[in-house]
Amino acid sequence: MRDLNTIDIIVGIAGAGKTTFLANLLTNKIRLFNFEFNPENTVCLSFSRMAKYVLAERLQHRYQVNTFHSYISKILANQGRLKIVSNNRLNAFFTDRGFNQLPFLKNSTDYYMADHIYSDLNKYRLMDISPEEYYELDNIEKSSDFYDLSKSEWLKLVKDFQAFIKESGSDYTDILVKGLTIAVNIPILVVDEANDLSPLMWKLIETWNIERVILVGDPNQNIYEFGGSTPKYLLLKKPVYELTKSHRVPDNILRYASRYIVYPFSKPLKGNGTEGDIEYGFVEEFIDALSYINKYDPTATSYLLSYRRKTAKYFSWLLEKEGIPHLLFNDPPYPIMSVRLYYLYHDPDQLSVHDLKQLIQHSRIKNKTKILQIFPKNEAYAKSIKANDVFSFRQYLKTLQTQPLDFFNIDEDTVAWYGKIKANPDWLSPKVNVSTIHQVKGGEADHVYVHFDANSSLDTEYRKRLYYVATTRARKNLMINPDLEEVP
């Protein structure tokens, strides 16, 4: 057990500017401790890639910020010990045993049997418990809708998977496990989003030689329990600093959301000094309002949030039917080739060498291989080609621009989306994002619709944290499904 005197905790509510505060702390603009931070004595780790990028940007890249996974991967690679299993081989492990294909190899967001069993194979490792203990937690039995394994069958599957990983290479979680075998000496470790630490990640912190650990986060925003994370490490001792004023959330929305806070702060919570709108309505009402919002405030951003991916896909379908440009799960809902075609015919300066390569690959031009050899493999040369080798780039760009749409080997869906983008270029930069609550954690929008369809069998405190995260994304207005007034 780590000495609590070597741990310092900083907590903050949603929208309180924890990342900005941390950046100012690391650049010594804010002084909390009797020592100074610098890139030589401090390592910055985060739970997610998104948080890593945001912190690195706030620090103006003075520090190298990593996720636990990327930090360990770099060390293992330098030691010649990094071998990663391919998605195809990982998928084959499950399909060979009668499970369905993993979702990341399907063009779909539905859940499949293999995805659930693979989640269990990850979670027992992230929780740092034995597969026997994990089975006794009822995690397997709760997934009985998707598979039916006895304890002996589960343990046999674990044993087979361990042998498979040893032979084929590490998956994401095994790289974290291998982190326990490396020697790490760190004067100061700063962990952003510490509310999402798993027991395995904490074991890494306890195993490595670290003089001081600084944890930053919000225990009320731990929503990755399905991945083994826990907020308990932010509750090990009294925090050295609390950020209790939200710069994002209006006063009344914060008061509403605060009803669902599980872990209280010692100081009163404050909103941003404004009053937003809180109302109940169905998704169709919110979509009707979007048409008005987009007309009178084209810069306004909006979220449509749900717990289930299936619900979010339905919302996307409704928006598409109304012709409202949007993102789905933070990505455009259309094929990238549709965008390339639009730029080719309407804004060719936006095309990169890589885009042109892809257009050539999908064209009916003969000798494509010879043509593609003109362009370097390294994307870093794209700008110099445009400037210094105008002939090779522009010649083939012009060749493609003069061709009709049927000159390209593309499917009907790509053609249809090209037509939609041509009719409404706002599809290229949508202000509306349809997503799950988990995928927008850390994000914010002016107008937020929350459809809280979380399973009622989920732990009550977990449901409260989910709802708190969802409602505190709102900067101005919040609309909630009227069936959800009593949630969680």
Positions of PLM-derived features:
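Extended, charge-rich low-complexity interaction segments
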Residues: 90-109, 272-283, 352-383
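Conserved P-loop NTPase-based nucleic-acid remodeling module centered on helicase motor cores
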Residues: 49-121, 322-323, 327-333
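Short, surface-exposed amphipathic charged segments that create phosphate/polyanion-binding patches used
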Residues: 9, 77-86, 255-260, 338-347
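P-loop NTPase Walker
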Residues: 1-83, 258, 440, 469-472
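Amphipathic alpha-helical "lid/sensor" segments that cap RecA-like P-loop NTPase cores
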Residues: 111-132, 299-322
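Core RecA-like ATPase module of SF1/SF2 helicases and allied nucleic-acid translocases
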Residues: 16, 49, 70, 74-77, ...
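Conserved helicase motor core of SF1/SF2 NTP-dependent helicases
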Residues: 11-16, 23-24, 47-50, 69, ...
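Accessory N-terminal region flanking or inserted into the helicase ATPase core
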Residues: 2-12, 20-21, 105-190, 199-203, ...
